[in-house]
């Protein structure tokens, strides 16, 4: 459709990467990309293949690229009153917090170990995870 012009000539392409709250909390707060010194910007981590596909679809070089975002939420000064340093340290905010580690890694219907979700629990341990190994992995010093 693009190549034969049946939908006209594309002038711009807007692409959005929607990362679920529990996915973001795992990958960019607790997970492999939690440290900007050791990882890549989110646009490279989440969108490099998207950009390849867009380049192929457009059959043209990109002239402008914009990415928006900053560390504005997961900071110590934004923590709720009564929050512990770590979720598993008896956090007073556990029940109302959507980012609670036990919810994300054990009970969340999309990501929880107890629901059979697989990822992200299966990347926290070297061996196939058990509840004990997941709790141990989540308690590794910051």
What are these regions, as identified by a protein language model?
Residues 138-142:
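Glycine-enriched catalytic-core subsegment of oxygenase/oxidase enzymes
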Residues 1-137:
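Predominantly a Rossmann-like dinucleotide-binding segment in NAD(P)-dependent oxidoreductases
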């Amino acid at each position: 459709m693009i190549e034969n012009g049946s939908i006209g000539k594309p002038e711009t392409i807007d692409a959005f990467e929607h990362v679920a709250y529990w996915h973001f909390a795992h990958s960019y707060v607790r997970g492999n990309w939690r440290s900007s010194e050791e990882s890549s910007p989110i646009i490279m981590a989440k969108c490099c293949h998207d950009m390849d596909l867009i380049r192929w679809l457009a059959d043209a070089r990109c002239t402008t690229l914009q990415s928006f975002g900053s560390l504005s939420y997961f900071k110590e000064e934004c923590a709720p009153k009564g929050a512990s340093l770590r979720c598993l340290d008896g956090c007073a905010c556990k029940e109302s917090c959507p980012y609670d580690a036990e919810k994300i890694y054990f009970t969340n219907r999309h990501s929880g170990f107890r629901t059979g979700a697989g990822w992200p629990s299966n990347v926290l341990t070297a061996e196939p995870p058990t509840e004990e190994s997941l709790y141990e992995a989540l308690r590794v010093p910051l």
